[in-house]
Amino acid sequence: DSQKVDGVQLIRTIADKDKDEEAAKKALDLFVSSFESKIKKRVEILALNYGYNENVAFEAIRCAFNKVWLYPTFDMGKSSCTNEENAIIIWLVKIAFSQMCQFTRTGECAQISEEEDLSVIENIDDVVNSIHVADLDPMVKMQYVMAFKKKISVLDEKHRIIYLTYKAYQRSGKKLPRKLLEKLRKRLGLSQSAIRVYKKQ
């Protein structure tokens, strides 16, 4: 590169986004344009080694930079590299790999937008769309939907809505977003403790 970019300084500027968001956005743009080409090949090779295609590698890279914006936690002190640029490249490739695993598992990875579209899930089509079963092979998808329908056919309306909403939004051990719980309580006219009882049944 004709112009040497100080990646560590850019990450610091991104980390100060609460103080100066405009400068942080510019720093992120410069960071992406400088490092994207440097990690692209490595991430594509990783994807191929794990049986994924270029599209998955592309998403993983995009999400890795989203993650840098959300959590600019690079620490040169934790790197075994003495060269800052190489240390950042290795750090980014690790993030991209974890984002790749997340993307292939759930169909989504780190997004910069914090505001999610949180809606109470009332029927099976909504849950199928929300957990990205839509991308599956049609036969596999049909089997999944059939098994799912059988499972929820025995539930009454309140149990069904609670089960489907948790199924769509709950990520490994994490609680549902507070906004969504409020919507669920309002929709069903139940308290949070009543919802917990329903969920256990």
Annotate each predicted stretch with a short phrase:
Residues 13-45, 55:
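A short, charge-rich alpha-helical start-of-domain segment used by transcription regulators
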Residues 18, 22, 119-153:
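Acidic, proline/glycine-rich intrinsically disordered inter-domain spacer in sigma factors
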Residues 55-66, 83-98:
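Structural recognition of an alpha-helix C-terminal capping motif at a helix-to-coil junction
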Residues 32, 149-183:
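Short amphipathic alpha helix immediately N-terminal
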Residues 45-49, 62-85:
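Sigma70-family region 2
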Residues 76, 93-114:
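Arg/Lys-rich amphipathic alpha helix in sigma70-family domain 2
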Residues 201:
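Alpha-helical DNA-recognition elements
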Residues 53, 191-194, 198:
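Short coil turns linking two alpha-helices in DNA-binding domains
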